[in-house]
UniProtKB/Swiss-Prot annotation:
It is found in: Cytoplasm, Cytosol; Peroxisome matrix. The lineage of its organism: Eukaryota, Viridiplantae, Streptophyta, Embryophyta, Tracheophyta. This is Catalase-2. Belongs to the catalase family. It comes from the Eukaryota. It comes from Arabidopsis thaliana. Its EC number is 1.11.1.6. GO terms for cellular component: cytosol; cytosolic ribosome; mitochondrion; peroxisomal matrix; peroxisome; plasma membrane; stromule. The gene is CAT2. The keyword Heme applies. Catalyzes the degradation of hydrogen peroxide (H(2)O(2)) generated by peroxisomal oxidases to water and oxygen, thereby protecting cells from the toxic effects of hydrogen peroxide.
Length: 492
């Protein structure tokens, strides 16, 4: 018998039931009892093992992005950007890289409807020849806050009330009344695009500012954008109620059925670029995640296309155990000093270790598809077969060496240790500009959603006044309409 052939995989299933240790099970229907009506015996190991495994089938759900669906496919470079990055998977047009993508809602639980007004996660794992690259983003190009210090409080405010387990507007609007930088995100969330029709008809964005580095070591700030070839479609409230009332997993089913039918969803990848030498030339901070970069002066540059042409084989193994982290990058791509990105670099890996264990990157869906080597040994659920005698570095008995050095962004850091906000907040200009691009009918729906939210009986006059003041600073007519309908005088 080849001991390596039968490593755990369903392809090696025996024709009969066995225990976890491989012993044959001749009766998988009845417990072992004393006589036909007597007590069950503790020595019924098969029963105990079966129940114990069942009791442990569930793992902690993600604290955010719990509800999601995944699919596999490929990314293909269509345009040469080798002048901007030395990333191997972007080296030339025609290069294809396997990917797995997870779409998700953000705040609500694993079994919640996919028709709730909520941002959508859009996370892509590239299995490159130089290791994995995780581009972990959302469907909106901006975020609520710009500093990760606020992230736990933000999620607590958006999550259900800890006393009643009910999501309530007064908690959300109380928290964000302290954070006017959230206005831009709300012009997306409370807009008509706040409920995507499904995952196929949805934009994607890397949200944070990253850096691209070319072979010469020249670095550029970069933003990543996914555009669906089938267009963006959304649900208005009435449609969401109808669709969600019929099938609370409609987006998951749409993705699965479309791929199964050969109707493969496709997205084009675009980037925006800023030379760090020019970062002070704008009226916003390029590292501020609450801002978009204006496309009229920073145009979208095409890079490639992503096609999802294969459904996952097992939901638990390739969706629940699928783990993303913005820290997972490859040569030619690096982090910027975006405050939210810097905190995500730690937090995502940390939550995966809590949820899946310290060896979560050994799980097949998370493991790199290229050769890899390190001395990270042992720990809970370490199932990698290793026969080395040397588990340290350096050693004259193990010829492993350092990889060839690759360019990283040049950076000179100086300054005082301090906790402070960025200088260019500019919280109101962009939300106002975006609101003014809406048609009158779309503006009216946006206003009505805010009327509904601010009409929560637990929202105080002070909080209503703050929000009307914020929206008045973004657009005077918007603030006036809200104030009139809520019978509140704006105070700027």
């Amino acid at each position: 018998m080849d001991p390596y052939k039968y490593r755990p995989a369903s392809s090696y299933n025996s024709p009969f039931f066995t225990t976890n240790s491989g012993a044959p099970v001749w009766n998988n229907n009845s417990s072992m009892t004393v006589g036909p009506r007597g007590p069950i015996l503790l020595e019924d190991y098969h029963l105990v093992e079966k129940l114990a495994n069942f009791d442990r089938e569930r793992i902690p759900e993600r604290v955010v992005h719990a509800r999601g669906a995944s699919a596999k496919g490929f990314f293909e470079v269509t345009h040469d950007i080798s002048n901007l990055t030395c990333a191997d998977f972007l080296r030339a047009p025609g290069v294809q890289t396997p990917v797995i993508v997870r779409f998700s809602t953000v705040i609500h639980e694993r079994g919640s409807p996919e028709t709730l007004r909520d941002p959508r996660g859009f996370a892509v794992k590239f299995y490159t020849r130089e290791g994995n690259f995780d581009l972990v983003g959302n469907n909106f190009p901006v975020f609520f806050i710009r500093d990760g210090m606020k992230f736990p409080d933000m999620v607590h405010a958006l999550k259900p009330n800890p006393k009643s387990h009910i999501q309530e507007n007064w908690r959300i609007l109380d928290f964000f009344s302290h954070h006017p930088e959230s206005l831009n995100m709300f012009t997306f969330l409370f807009d008509d695009i706040g409920i995507p029709q499904d995952y196929r008809h949805m934009d994607g964005s890397g949200v944070n500012t990253y850096m691209l580095i070319n072979k010469a070591g020249k670095a550029h700030y970069v933003k990543f954008h996914w555009k669906p070839t089938c267009g963006v479609k959304s649900l208005l409230e009435e449609d969401a109620i109808r669709v969600g009332g019929t099938n609370h997993s409609h987006a998951t089913q749409d993705l699965y059925d479309s791929i199964a039918a050969g109707n493969y969803p496709e997205w084009k990848l675009f980037i925006q670029i800023i030379d760090p030498a020019d970062e002070d030339k704008f009226d916003f901070d390029p590292l501020d995640v609450t801002k978009t970069w204006p496309e009229d002066i920073l145009p979208l540059q095409p890079v490639g296309r992503m096609v999802l042409n294969k459904n996952i084989d097992n939901f638990f193994a390739e969706n629940e155990q699928l783990a993303f982290c913005p820290a997972i990058i490859v040569p030619g791509i690096h982090y910027s000093d975006d405050k939210l990105l810097q905190t995500r670099v730690f937090s995502y890996a940390d939550t995966q270790r809590h949820r899946l264990g310290p060896n979560y990157l050994q799980l097949p869906v998370n493991a790199p598809k290229c050769a890899h080597h390190n001395n990270h040994h042992e720990g809970f659920m370490n199932f990698m077969h290793r026969d080395e005698e040397v588990n340290y570095f350096p050693s004259r008995y193990d010829q492993v060496r350092h990889a060839e050095k690759y360019p990283t962004p040049p950076a000179v850091c100086s300054g005082k240790r301090e906790r402070c906000i960025i200088e260019k907040e500019n919280n109101f200009k962009e939300p106002g500009e975006r609101y003014r691009t809406f048609t009158p009918e779309r503006q009216e729906r946006f206003i009505q959603r805010w009327i509904d939210a601010l009409s929560d009986p637990r929202i105080t006059h002070e909080i209503r006044s703050i929000w009307i003041s914020y929206w008045s600073q973004a657009d005077k007519s918007l603030g006036q309409k809200l104030a009139s309908r809520l019978n509140v005088r704006p105070s700027i």
